[in-house]
Regions:
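RNA pseudouridine synthases
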Residues: 1-146
Length: 146
């Protein structure tokens, strides 16, 4: 599973702390995000995103726009248990994952840019932080019918 999200991103009209997608292009600037599913864990999915543009909160906003908020992203609704059952055991599991990863599940694996003076292309790679890796391992071990 993979796809592309296109839509202008600008300041949310009612909540100035959030950004929003304006598909009609009436606000903001053009933004393009390519995504690819890496692994599915029942109620959450690990994805890789590649950006063509660089807008504020781009991944967070585009993922929310297509109905897939980032795990534990309080600003955009990913801190809510939106999918799955309402069983106490599931809620307890998710709350435990929130405590393991007390921030939005977002990591810049690769950053690259052209140096402003030398013109040399610089690329930096980084492995997943321990908290994200621990949360992923918890989801790998979770069975939907627990």
């Amino acid at each position: 599973d993979e796809g592309t999200v296109r839509g202008h991103i600008g300041r949310h009209l009612k909540d100035r702390l959030q950004m929003d997608v304006f598909v009609d292009g009436s606000h903001g600037k053009e933004a393009v995000t390519h995504y690819k599913v890496l692994e599915r864990f029942g109620y959450v999915t690990l994805v890789s995103c590649r950006l063509e543009t660089g807008s504020t909160h781009q991944i967070r906003v585009h993922m929310k726009h297509i109905g897939h908020t980032l795990f534990n992203d309080e600003r955009y609704g990913g801190d809510k248990i939106l999918k799955g059952t309402t069983f106490a055991k599931y809620k307890q599991f998710v709350e435990n994952c929130f405590s393991v990863l007390p921030r939005q599940a977002l990591h810049a694996k690769t950053l690259g840019f052209e140096h402003p003076v030398s013109g040399e292309y610089l690329r930096f790679d980084s492995e997943l932080p321990a908290d994200m890796q621990a949360c992923i391992e918890k989801w790998r071990g979770y069975k939907i019918n627990n």
